[in-house]
Amino acid sequence: MFINNFDPVAFSLFSLEFRWYSLSYIFGILAGWVLAKRIFIKDDNLKEKFDDYITYIILGIIIGGRLGYVIFYNLDYYLENIFEIFKIWNGGMSFHGGLLGVIVMSVWFAKKHNHNSYVYLDIVSSVAPIGIFFGRIANFINSELYGKETTLPWGIKFEKIDEIYRHPSQLYEAFFEGLLLFFILIYFRKASSAKNPGFLSGIFLIFYSVFRFFIEFLRMPDEQLGYVLFKLSMGQILCLVFFIFGSYLTLKKYDHQK
C-alpha cells in the first residue's frame, strides 16, 4: 500500500506556478513532434509541413478537449456559467473531445494543402500514446480520475481525497493506453495494410477504446455525472462509439489492401 501526497505544482518562477498537468501537455506535444519528425515521417516535404501542422494539433487539443468536457461531462453547469468555459486553468479537459478536435483540424489542414488527412492522422496516432502517458501521470500527481477501493498490495491512498486505498487507475491507463499502445502501433506499422492511410488511425482507436473501456470499471465515475447508462460511464460510452468507428476504418483499409 502506498500514499499519494504529491504537490500538483511542479515549481514556481517569480509569482507564476507551473503545474504538472500543464507541463504534461507541453512534454507530450514536444515528444510527439520530435518522434514524428525523426522516426515516423520519411518524406522531407511532409516533415516541413508537419511544423505548421503542429499548430493545428495544439488548437484541436485545447479547443476540442475543453468543448468536449463542457458538452460531454458538465453541460448543465456551463450553460448556467458560460464564462467559466474559457477558464481552462481551472481544469476540465476531455480526451475524446481533444481527439475530435484533432480530427477536425487535421481534415482542415489537409484540405488546405491538398493532402490526404489520414496521412496526418496516422502520424498523430503513432505518437499520441506518449502524450497520453504524460497526461495520465499528471492525473495521478493531481489525485484526479482515481480508482475504486481496493485491498490489493499496490493500492494507493490519495490523501487529498480520503483515507481509502484505491486502484491507481491513472497508472493503469498510463501503461496500457500510453506505453503498451505505443509499441502496439509500432508493431502494426510493419503490416502491409499500414501503407493505406487511415489503417493506423483505426488501430489506435480500437486499442485505446478497449483499454480505457475496461480500466474504467476500476475507476470512479465523474462525480457530477455518475453512471450514464447500464452502469457505464460517459467515458465508456464514448469509447464504444470510437471503437465502432475504429473497427470500420481498420477493416475498410485492410480490405482495400487485399
Regions found by a protein language model. Give the residues of each.
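A feature for loop-to-transmembrane-helix boundaries and adjacent hydrophobic helices
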Residues: 1-258
